[in-house]
Regions:
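Phosphate/NTP-binding elements of NTP-utilizing enzymes
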Residues: 1-192
Length: 192
């Protein structure tokens, strides 16, 4: 099976050309904007599943402003990606609470909402390290302080070969703290 201790899976083989830079990116921050049907969420879901299978000590946190919106958005996209990649039997799916577990290693994709900030503190994974955060519909996060607190969810040093990454996906906007931080005044390690 591709991606499991063999040749890496390639998004371009599954989803079309033009995604290689996105797939390979290891910037600390990725800021991905696009209109409806731009494939940003589907591409992110495919990459997430592939990365979990390729990095056996990595785990991911998936966030939206409201926890209740995750099931029909990110969670559904990740289930689609698992099916599309043909690895359904390798994943355990929990719907209450939302949780995806990669069975061969015990790695997790954890889901949280910013509407319950206490559930964002002290997130612990069963195996490895929490390395990556995906913030879907990031424009809904209207308070930059909420994002700063989210950044604290990935703490400490990571073992060699792993990297910290925050990916913000959203539809285009006019005025938002995201534009100011990552486009207008950024000196951070950002993939735009």
């Amino acid at each position: 099976m591709p991606g499991v201790n063999s040749e890496p899976l390639r998004l371009s083989d599954i989803y079309g050309q033009g995604y290689d830079c996105f797939i390979k990116d290891k910037s600390q921050f990725e800021v991905i904007k696009g209109g409806r049907a731009s494939k940003k969420s589907a591409s992110m879901a495919l990459r997430t599943i592939m990365r979990i299978m390729q990095y056996p000590d990595a785990n991911m946190l998936v966030v939206r402003r409201v926890y209740g919106t995750l099931k029909d958005s990110c969670f559904a996209n990740l289930l689609w990606a698992i099916d599309r990649l043909g690895v359904t039997k390798r994943w355990k799916v929990n719907t209450n609470p939302l949780l995806l577990t990669y069975i061969p290693t015990g790695q997790q994709i954890i889901f949280r909402g910013l509407d319950d900030p206490l559930k964002l503190t002290s997130i612990t994974v069963r195996r490895g390290k929490l390395c990556w955060v995906w913030v879907e519909e990031a424009y809904e996060v209207t308070d930059p302080e909420a994002f700063r607190k989210l950044e604290m969810s990935i703490r400490g040093m990571l073992p060699p070969g792993l990297f910290k990454q925050f990916t913000l996906t959203f539809n285009p906007w006019r005025e938002n703290w995201i534009k100011e931080r990552f486009w207008d005044n950024s000196e951070e390690d950002v993939f735009l």
